[in-house]
UniProtKB/Swiss-Prot annotation:
This is Uncharacterized lipoprotein SSP0535. It comes from Staphylococcus saprophyticus subsp. saprophyticus (strain ATCC 15305 / DSM 20229 / NCIMB 8711 / NCTC 7292 / S-41). A lipid is attached at C18 (N-palmitoyl cysteine). Residues 18-169 are annotated as: Disordered. It is a lipid-anchor. One of its GO terms (cellular component) is plasma membrane. Residues 91-169 have a biased composition (Low complexity). Keywords: Cell membrane, Lipoprotein, Membrane, Palmitate, Signal. The lineage of its organism: Bacteria, Bacillati, Bacillota, Bacilli, Bacillales. It comes from the Bacteria. It is found in: Cell membrane. The keyword Lipoprotein applies. Residues 1-17 form the signal peptide. Residues 25-76 have a biased composition (Basic and acidic residues). A lipid is attached at C18 (S-diacylglycerol cysteine).
């Protein structure tokens, strides 16, 4: 554009010079020189302007390239940021998934713990029920044992009472005696007169022997047969009592029983008649 302007000015000047042909040559030369100088200066200015414009265009191009590079870098940075954001989102999502999975595992473990707790509570309830049953069973067993012990105590008390009575009877000496209104029946059966003192030292206690013989005779006929009389027979080492009882099953007869040194009772005649 500047070149065209310079050319136009030059052409104008040339036309002006031609129209002013009346001027002297020196003036023309001077004017021509000035014009040429001015044209040269303008041409230089135009060149300088063109150079500046070119430099400016280059700078613009460089700036444009720099801007493009900068934009490219910015795009790369944005892409990298987006990728990083995507990676972070992926990481966050993965972390969230892991957290959710962990929470699910925790919830599952919590549920499992709750189930185990329920199982433990159920097991504890069963154990308590078993303990209650065992306690009740032990209570029943203890009650049964106490009852058995009470029964044993009663039995022992009865045995002790019997033993006490027997001991009292054994320890307390009772001299042999005949029955009330006795009829000599046993006395008539014996032969001879053995040493009564020696015989009593070898024979059982008189009262015990009489009680045992009475029990045996009453059991024989099922009656209460009154005691009648006694006698001692035998010799040294072989003594025995002879007892007679009024036979209530067959009135007028007597039941004869003997008791030896070992305390053995024998009914020798259930219905003796003299």
């Amino acid at each position: 554009m500047k070149k065209l302007l310079a050319g136009f000015l030059t052409l104008s000047l040339a036309l002006a010079a031609c129209s002013n042909g009346s001027d002297d040559d020196s003036s023309k030369k001077d004017d021509s020189s000035k014009d040429n100088q001015s044209s040269d200066d303008k041409s230089k200015d135009s060149k300088n302007d063109d150079k500046k414009n070119n430099d400016s265009d280059k700078d613009k191009d460089n700036n444009s390239d720099s801007d493009k590079n900068s934009d490219s870098k910015s795009d790369d940075s944005s892409s990298s940021d987006r990728n990083n954001g995507d990676d972070e989102n992926s990481s966050d999502n993965a972390s969230g998934s892991d957290s959710s999975s962990s929470n699910n595992d925790s919830n599952a473990n919590s549920d499992g713990s709750s189930s185990n707790a329920d199982g433990d509570n159920a097991s504890g309830n069963n154990d308590n029920a078993n303990n209650a049953t065992s306690s009740e069973s032990n209570g029943n067993e203890n009650g049964a044992m106490n009852d058995a012990n009470g029964s044993n105590s009663n039995d022992n008390a009865s045995a002790d009472a019997n033993n006490g009575a027997s001991s009292a009877n054994t320890s307390q000496y009772v001299a042999p005696y005949q029955g009330q209104n006795a009829v000599p029946v046993a006395q008539n059966i014996t032969s001879g007169t053995p040493d009564s003192q020696a015989a009593l030292q070898n024979l059982p206690n008189f009262q015990n022997a009489l009680d045992n013989a009475t029990t045996e005779v009453n059991g024989l006929n099922g009656q209460s047969n009154p005691y009648n009389d006694y006698a001692i027979e035998g010799s040294e080492g072989n003594y025995s009592y002879i007892f007679s009882f009024q036979n209530q099953a067959q009135p007028g007869t007597y039941t004869i029983a003997t008791v030896d040194q070992q305390g053995t009772v024998r009914v020798v005649d259930p219905a003796y008649q003299q």
